[in-house]
Amino acid sequence: MPGCTSRLLPEGPFSRNQALAVTTAYLNVLIEDDQGTHFRLVIRNAEGQLRWRCWNFEPDAGKQLNPYLASEGILRQ
């Protein structure tokens, strides 16, 4: 569908644009520890507690984050 962005990440490393698409889709997903070229994508629960985080350059970052996005991601309306 034109104009739609994925709500999940690729299984491996991900770009800043891919991370921004995910943070735009979910209320509880944030970019933290931003070093410019690398950063962490963080998922927090409704109480703000850390559920999972990965650096964007990790070989299986998306594979680790996607199950948490699917089960604990709070979509924006």
Curated annotation (Swiss-Prot):
Pfam families: DUF905. Gene3D superfamilies: ykff protein like domains. Belongs to the UPF0401 family. This is UPF0401 protein ECP_3010. It comes from Escherichia coli O6:K15:H31 (strain 536 / UPEC).
